[in-house]
């Protein structure tokens, strides 16, 4: 446990930031999984495109605000785009 008042405050702050970061990353994982579930279930392409757009928006936002690395956001967007394009060709 922290011995100084400032260390206690830093602990509180880091706990809050950690919870916020985990929540944002969890939202992203849920959006990506939702898109993958739609693809696996054979949903209509417009539904998959809506899920793709929402996932890409979240990726962009988290990448710009440094919740995830910008290159990771770009890589994930590319992977999702590839899935979407292959899904369109499969039908």
UniProtKB/Swiss-Prot annotation:
Compositional bias per record (Basic and acidic residues), positions renumbered to this chain: 1-18
Top-rank taxon: Bacteria
UniProt feature coiled coil, ranges: none
Pfam families referenced in this protein's UniProt entry, alphabetically: Ribosomal_S20p (PF01649)
Gene3D superfamilies (UniProt xref): Ribosomal protein S20
GO molecular function terms attached to this record: small ribosomal subunit rRNA binding; structural constituent of ribosome
Region (Disordered): 1-25
Record keywords: Ribonucleoprotein, Ribosomal protein, RNA-binding, rRNA-binding
Keyword set includes Signal: no
Function: Binds directly to 16S ribosomal RNA.
Similarity annotation: Belongs to the bacterial ribosomal protein bS20 family.
Protein name: Small ribosomal subunit protein bS20
Lineage: Bacteria, Pseudomonadati, Chlorobiota, Chlorobiia, Chlorobiales
């Amino acid at each position: 446990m922290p011995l100084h008042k400032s260390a206690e405050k830093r602990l509180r702050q880091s706990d809050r930031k950690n919870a916020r970061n985990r929540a944002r990353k969890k939202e992203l994982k849920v959006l990506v999984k939702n898109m993958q579930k739609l693809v696996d279930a054979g949903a209509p392409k417009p539904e998959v495109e809506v899920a793709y757009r929402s996932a890409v928006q979240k990726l962009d936002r988290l990448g710009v605000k440094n919740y995830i690395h910008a290159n990771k956001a770009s890589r994930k967007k590319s992977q999702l785009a590839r899935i979407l394009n292959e899904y369109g060709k499969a039908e």
